[in-house]
């Protein structure tokens, strides 16, 4: 049976009752008081995010915010390498270690695409990931994750992350990210707990306040939302 317009598909709180983060966001990567504080201090001290490539326009019709993608990839790779000590261990342990992404193909595999536009796109994406990794390594030195770990994390972010304009961040949302596996994925919206946002709600200052206070949740509703999932792929 088809779902009705506005019906909730899935909803996830951004923070739990103790104000601890549930979602892994680019904001948390720079939060020196959060669970990623050790990484955040290094990222902020080295101004690492300013070294990334920013927003890149793509001939496929949508931009790639590589700064946010690389920032989130760094945090994800770090969490994987921390193992038992990772804050998001339960989440990262469930992520597949093989990602269906052209940027993960080796040269021999790409040769099979000879003559296709995909091969050039894959090469550009691989070069971009290498550039972002080199910026990471130059800033963090020996504390940087391995290139293979970073490359996997970057591909995972592009496959699963949501851009949340209302919270000005990109996020990996445990559970909800399963719906973000295609360009036509349902849209998402940021809501107050117990309150449904609509297009006529102009109380932007209040929206910022509830987001900062941890009273936000990300919800997928049929046909409703401000940010199309998958637009950063």
Per-segment meaning from a language model:
Residues 1-16, 20-29, 34-40, 78-233:
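Long, positively charged leader/targeting segments at protein N-termini
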Residues 30-76:
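Short peripheral tails and domain-boundary helices/loops at the edges of structured domains
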């Amino acid at each position: 049976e088809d779902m009705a317009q506005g019906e909730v598909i899935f909803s996830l709180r951004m923070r739990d009752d103790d104000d601890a983060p549930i979602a892994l966001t680019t904001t948390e990567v720079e939060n020196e008081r959060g669970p990623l504080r050790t990484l955040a201090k290094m990222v902020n001290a080295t101004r690492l995010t300013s070294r990334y490539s920013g927003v890149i326009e793509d001939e496929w019709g949508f931009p790639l915010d590589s700064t946010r993608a690389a920032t989130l990839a760094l945090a994800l790779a770090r969490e994987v390498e921390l193992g038992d000590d990772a804050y998001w261990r339960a989440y990262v342990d469930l992520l597949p270690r093989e990602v269906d992404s052209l940027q993960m193909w080796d040269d021999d595999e790409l040769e099979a695409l000879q003559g296709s536009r995909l091969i050039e796109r894959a090469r550009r994406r691989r070069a971009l990931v290498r550039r972002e990794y080199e910026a990471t390594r130059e800033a963090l030195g020996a504390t940087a994750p391995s290139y293979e770990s970073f490359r996997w994390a970057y591909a995972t972010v592009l496959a699963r992350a949501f851009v949340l304009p209302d919270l000005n961040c990109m996020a990996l949302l445990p559970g909800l990210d399963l719906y973000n596996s295609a360009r036509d994925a349902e849209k998402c919206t940021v809501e107050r707990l117990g309150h449904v946002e609509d297009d006529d709600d102009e109380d932007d200052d209040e929206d910022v306040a509830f987001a900062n206070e941890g009273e936000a949740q990300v919800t997928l509703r049929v046909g409703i939302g401000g940010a199309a999932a998958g637009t950063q792929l």
